[in-house]
Amino acid sequence: MPGGDRDHEFREYVLGDRTRLMRTAMLLTAGDRYAAEDLVQTALTKVYVHWRRIHHEGAGPYAHRVLVNAFLDDRRRAARRPELISADAFEPRSHGEVDAADLLTVRKALLEIAPRQRAVLVLRYFQDLDVAECARVLECSEGTVKSQTAKALKRLRDVMTDRAAEGAE
């Protein structure tokens, strides 16, 4: 029963990686749960279609690449539309308690960063991918990942500094 084995293997993959995909999608969409679920569904659909080819190589990197590409495609196609920010967009890891106000500030700041740069930050710092893995997911050179990371961090610093100055007034 070859189809059954494929379905079983795919189901096991989804059970193991869906949370990570959803976390990445939530970060990319700055907390828009519905858009994040759409991205994850798109990624998992493509993973399933190509399962025979990719499951031995590792479906995770492929799924994350599809997820990021779907996000970037959506941003290119769509006219600027309001971004929704939900309280549970960031699910802090077990590194300790994180102030909800700080998370909201970071989420809002991420909205002001170009989608490609936001994707680099999410993959590098929230998904803990190294430069080479990030380059594979984004289908670009390692140098591009490094330069986009530097530009994104500078932009994030500028936005956060501006927000802090506004709050102090």
Give the ranges of each region predicted by the language model:
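Arg/Lys-rich amphipathic alpha helix in sigma70-family domain 2
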Residues: 65-86, 99
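DNA-recognition helix of helix-turn-helix
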Residues: 138-163
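Short amphipathic alpha-helical boundary/capping segments
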Residues: 10-12, 105-113
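The DNA-contacting recognition helix of HTH DNA-binding domains
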Residues: 18, 33, 117, 142, ...
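Short, small-hydrophobic-rich alpha-helical interface motif
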Residues: 21, 25, 36-47, 66, ...
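A short pre-motif secondary-structure segment
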Residues: 120-124
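Short, charged helix-capping/linker segments at alpha-helix termini
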Residues: 2-12, 22-42, 50-58
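Short helix-coil-helix linker/hinge
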Residues: 100, 110-118
